[in-house]
């Protein structure tokens, strides 16, 4: 399993066991078997450890291309391409089924994580809205 996936699985398990505020990044690093410093080479913060990175460079580039009428010039085709890029980024990890199941379990057990998840989704929806309006 790639280290970034190990980090997510460990972070999600810690949320399920202790709640979002119930563990430290030091504990997460220990569970993954890396130093705290090494942990931060892979993730930005606790939220990204638990929920994954919010917006990759690839996805942001796709939003910019979409807003500019690229790559095909067809709204329908470009919408499909943008949606598939976002979807593939979210589920492209071969460990997606396990991570998805753990995420659902963590969201069901922790209200703070649910709030962070909703805020993140609102930001992504806003970014999609901006790209559509720019087009």
Where are these regions (language model features)?
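Key DNA-contact positions within bacterial/archaeal DNA-binding proteins
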Residues: 37
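HTH DNA-binding helix-turn interface
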Residues: 18-20, 40-56
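Short helix-capping/turn signature of helix-turn-helix
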Residues: 43, 102-109
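Basic, helix-initiating cap at the start of DNA-binding domains
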Residues: 1-33, 70
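Hydrophobic alpha-helical connector segments
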Residues: 62-96, 100
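Short alpha-helical functional segments enriched in proximate histidine and acidic residues
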Residues: 14, 42, 131
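Amphipathic alpha-helical packing segments from all-alpha helical-bundle domains
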Residues: 106-135
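Hydrophobic/aromatic residues within well-ordered alpha-helical segments
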Residues: 3, 46, 79, 83, ...
């Amino acid at each position: 399993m790639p280290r970034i996936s190990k980090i997510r699985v460990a972070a999600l398990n810690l949320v399920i066991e202790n709640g979002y505020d119930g563990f430290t990044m030091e504990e997460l690093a220990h569970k993954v078997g890396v130093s705290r410093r090494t942990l931060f080479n892979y993730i930005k913060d606790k939220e990204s450890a638990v929920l994954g990175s919010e917006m990759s460079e690839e996805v942001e580039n796709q939003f910019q291309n979409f807003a500019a009428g690229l790559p095909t010039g067809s709204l329908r085709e470009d919408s499909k391409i943008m949606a598939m890029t976002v979807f593939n980024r979210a589920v492209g990890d071969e460990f997606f089924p396990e991570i998805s199941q753990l995420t659902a379990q963590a969201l069901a057990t922790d209200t703070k994580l649910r709030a962070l998840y909703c805020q993140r989704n609102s930001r992504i929806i806003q970014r999609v809205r901006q790209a559509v309006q720019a087009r």
